[in-house]
Structure formats: C-alpha cells, structure tokens
Amino acid sequence: MLHIVEYTVGPMEQPLGEFEQLVLMAIVRLEGDAYGATIKRDIEARTGRGLAISAVYTTLERLEQKGCVRSWIGQPTAERGGRRRKHFELKPAGARALRAAYSAYTEMAAGLERRLKALR
C-alpha cells in the first residue's frame, strides 16, 4: 500500500502514518472485537504482510497518545487462562483522521485501475 499523504490529529498535530491508518481500519472492521491479536490477523490477511505483535501494540499505544483510540480491559476469559484482553475503539479524532485518509486515497486512486493494467 502506498503512503501518499500524512494526516494530522490531536492537539499536537502529529502525523498519522500508513501503518497507523491500517490499524485504524482494522479497528473499524473488527467493531467491538478489536484487540491486538485480531488487529494483527486482520492486517496480515488483507495486506499479505507478516507482522510482529509488538509492532501492533506499539502503534496502538501511539494512537492512544494521539487521541485516536481508547482502550478498555475486558473480562477474564477461560480460553485465555483467566487473563483479560485489552480492547480498542476509535475516538472521534481517529474517525476524522481515517475519513480524511480514506477520502484522499480514493481521490488519488480514481482512474488508476485502467492505467495500472496498461503498465508493463
């Protein structure tokens, strides 16, 4: 995936990178079931990239600091040996940044399909 434009969010207007955009997209797709492992699997399945779980968690922490996502700790589950999961959801700033990124990407991609097929 090309990283065409950087988007800014939050009070410090920090840039939103390509992987941050992918993480935000995964959170939206996963709705209430967005936690580190499901986010990792979603991105891997859709991009064909192999990811380290640490990269996902580092990005989630950064997105939380930027005010794009919020997290909460779920209830312990038997499948996790009584451990809890940390879930994530978009905050309004994250939704705005993702909408802007999506809009710019689709605008930039408009009309490229035919031309890309013609390239050798």
Describe the predicted segments one by one.
Residues 56-63:
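Basic amphipathic alpha-helical segments that dock to polyanions
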Residues 84:
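Exposed loop/turn and edge beta-strand positions of beta-sandwich/beta-sheet ligand-binding modules
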Residues 66-81, 89:
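Beta-hairpin "wing" of winged helix-turn-helix
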Residues 15, 61, 78-80:
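Short secondary-structure boundary/capping segments
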Residues 13-55:
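N-terminal helix-turn-helix DNA-binding core of bacterial DNA-binding proteins
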Residues 4, 93-120:
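Amphipathic alpha-helical dimerization/coiled-coil segments
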Residues 24, 87-89:
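Short aromatic/hydrophobic contact patches that present stacked aromatics
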